[in-house]
């Protein structure tokens, strides 16, 4: 099991390679990364078989920025018929797993394999159970089978508590018809990713206050209002009338980068199209000056050196807040609903 297989957004294979290579260097793991542009996946091949497991046990998956999902294992070539027998033979040395996901990559070819996977899963699951390779135990690793085609599959495993919460890292979120824009799903996905579900009622509680910078027409504001959070929506553009009638929104026509609330708020959210360095400086100001307790902010990405630039900006925010003597947790992820951007979550601890 010397190979790590990583899913990603198509076009960001290079960023995944850069990030996983950086991680391997920090862990002193020799190996190399490779990816085909547009393939929606990347691989890291470790020089030593045990290093794949060491890498995955040394870091939390949620701390990675560009990978959507990961697994360690190897490729298996399948015949036209009797695929299950060949797979069982290939899995002979794998540990007993507590759950099974059949996955595909996020490309048109991958999506065409979804029907095959749905038909194949039931007989495969039955065979794995009979062979004793699959049991119902959430504490055991998850078996992740990523089909590149009907004849090639990456047979991988990952610890059930250290991988994506959805197959392929793709959330199944329903667009609310009342929301004024599809961008609303970005904020909902961010909450799922950064905030444990059991903490939502505490950290996204009715009666809290928020500022939405660059709010129009109100996709992110809608999510806040839906949880009965009072929002100051900052944008020179018009807000959806339905939100203004809700009684939870005050519209301030102002520049999102210069606006400051009269009183600290619980949340600041921002999805403004701007150079990432300027947005990063704004994040540091809001958290550093105690203007908000938590924030979800999108950083738009440059055309080149995207991983290096994100890493540089995150380090800058972290060091800037540390110099102020503040304890702030920082998370960053390219979410499924993100495009040429990443989503940052920051939470200030203490006073």
Swiss-Prot record:
Keyword Chaperone part of the UniProt annotation: no
EC supergroup of this enzyme: transferase
Active site positions: 300 (proton acceptor)
Residues that coordinate or bind S-adenosyl-L-methionine: 183, 216-219, 235, 255, 271
Highest taxon of source: Bacteria
Entry's EC annotation: 2.1.1.186
GO biological process: methylation; rRNA processing
Keyword annotations from UniProtKB, A to Z: Cytoplasm, Methyltransferase, rRNA processing, S-adenosyl-L-methionine, Transferase
GO molecular function: S-adenosylmethionine-dependent methyltransferase activity
HAMAP family: 23SrRNA_methyltr_M
Annotated family: Belongs to the class I-like SAM-binding methyltransferase superfamily. RNA methyltransferase RlmE family. RlmM subfamily.
SUBUNIT field: Monomer.
Protein name in UniProt: Ribosomal RNA large subunit methyltransferase M
Organism the protein comes from: Ectopseudomonas mendocina (strain ymp) (Pseudomonas mendocina)
Organism phylogeny: Bacteria, Pseudomonadati, Pseudomonadota, Gammaproteobacteria, Pseudomonadales
């Amino acid at each position: 099991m010397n190979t790590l297989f990583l899913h990603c957004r198509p076009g960001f294979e290079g960023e995944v390679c850069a990030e996983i290579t950086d991680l391997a260097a920090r862990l002193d793991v020799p190996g190399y990364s490779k990816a085909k542009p547009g393939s929606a996946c990347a691989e890291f091949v470790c020089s030593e078989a045990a290093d794949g497991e060491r890498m995955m046990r040394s870091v939390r998956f949620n701390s990675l920025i560009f990978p959507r999902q990961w697994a360690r294992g190897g490729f298996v070539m399948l015949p036209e018929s009797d695929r299950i027998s060949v797979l069982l033979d290939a899995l002979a040395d794998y540990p007993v797993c507590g759950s099974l996901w059949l996955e595909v990559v996020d490309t048109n070819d991958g999506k065409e394999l979804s029907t095959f996977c749905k038909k194949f899963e039931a007989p495969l699951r039955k065979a794995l159970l009979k062979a004793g390779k699959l049991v119902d135990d959430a504490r055991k690793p998850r078996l992740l089978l990523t089909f590149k085609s009907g004849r090639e599959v990456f047979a991988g495993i990952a610890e059930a508590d250290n991988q994506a919460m959805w197959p392929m890292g793709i959330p199944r979120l329903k667009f609310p018809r009342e929301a004024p824009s599809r961008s609303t799903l970005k904020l909902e996905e961010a909450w799922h990713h950064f905030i444990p579900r059991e903490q939502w009622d505490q950290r996204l509680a009715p009666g809290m206050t928020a500022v939405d910078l660059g709010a129009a027409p109100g996709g992110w504001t809608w999510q806040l209002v839906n949880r009965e959070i009072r929002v100051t929506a900052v944008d020179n553009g018009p807000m959806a009338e339905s939100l203004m009638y809700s009684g939870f929104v005050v519209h301030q026509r102002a520049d999102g980068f210069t606006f400051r609330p009269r009183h600290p708020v619980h949340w600041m959210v921002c999805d403004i199209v701007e150079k990432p360095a300027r947005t990063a400086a704004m994040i540091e100001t809001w958290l550093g000056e105690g203007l908000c307790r938590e924030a979800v902010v999108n950083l738009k990405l440059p055309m080149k050196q995207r991983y290096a630039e994100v890493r540089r900006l995150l380090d800058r925010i972290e060091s800037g807040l540390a110099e102020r003597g503040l304890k702030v947790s920082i998370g960053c992820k390219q979410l499924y609903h993100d495009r040429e951007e990443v989503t940052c979550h920051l939470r200030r601890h203490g006073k």
